[in-house]
Design a protein with these regions (language model features):
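Hydrophobic alpha-helical bundle cores within soluble ligand-binding/oligomerization subdomains
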Residues: 1-246
């Protein structure tokens, strides 16, 4: 122990700061360089921004980019898992009043409902199921909150995660293409951030007790719902929207 490097000294002031500035874990999938920005498994995120989102997810899960054959198989697995979504579990969302509550509250309820219906106990299977089913969950929440539950379109297995989300919302034509580009850029940019923010820390803390993937992610999303954390995501979306008017 005496030969180990000290990486941080905790002071009394740190204990009164809500862990601000205190390292709470390590991350092997990404890091943030103060000059060059975010890197995923050694790749600058800018080099990944034009890839399909599924391939970037594969990179984060396997620490390498997929071959064409692996990419095709990964897409097919996600499409199959999306088809198996327990839609009955999401009826709880239909009992909520359109426009009521915060969207993040709806998301946490939806996540826990999916988990109650289909937790397998296998971390990879549950993670893949959740990744595959998030587009439909988010589309349902958006339409139900807007009082338009009948607007949900059936998913298309040949479409990717972002494309299916846009499709299920009923967006078409040039608007669908532009929205898809913007959301894919936003999605890839937010996939991983070094593991030190509040939502990631909260999700890891809950997972450390061997809670399910669904419970852990719901906890992370509840942490994200606070304005001191989630407001940054909103500001980023506003920034991406401005960029989309220029050249995305």
């Amino acid at each position: 122990m005496g030969d180990e490097e000290t990486i941080f000294t905790i002071t009394e002031a740190n204990l009164d700061s809500g862990l601000r500035g205190v390292p709470v874990g390590t991350c092997k999938t990404s890091f943030v360089d103060p000059i060059e920005g975010v890197h995923y498994v050694g790749y600058p995120v800018g080099d990944l921004a034009n890839l399909e989102e599924e391939d970037v997810i594969y990179l984060l899960m396997h620490k390498r980019l997929p071959s064409p054959e692996e990419s095709e198989a990964f897409h097919a697995e996600l499409a199959h898992r999306a088809e198996e979504i327990p839609t009955g579990a999401l009826r709880v969302l239909e009992s909520l009043t359109p426009g009521s509550g915060h969207p993040m509250d709806w998301l946490a309820i939806g996540l826990m409902s999916l988990g109650a219906a289909d937790t397998t106990g296998d971390a990879r299977a549950d993670a893949m199921n959740l990744i595959a089913r998030m587009p439909e969950l988010m589309a349902r929440i958006f339409l139900l909150r807007g009082g338009k539950p009948e607007g949900l379109r059936p998913r298309k297995p040949e479409l990717g995660l972002v494309e299916n989300f846009v499709h299920m919302l009923g967006v078409e034509g040039d608007e669908a293409e532009r929205m898809g580009r913007m959301l894919r850029f936003f999605f890839i940019l937010h996939m991983d951030h070094g593991g030190g923010n509040l939502s990631t820390f909260s999700g890891k803390a809950v997972a450390s007790g061997r809670a399910s993937i669904y419970a852990s992610i719901a906890s992370a999303m509840n942490a994200l719902s606070g304005p001191l954390h989630g407001r940054a995501n909103q500001a980023c979306l506003e920034f991406v929207q401005r960029l989309s008017l220029i050249h995305i």
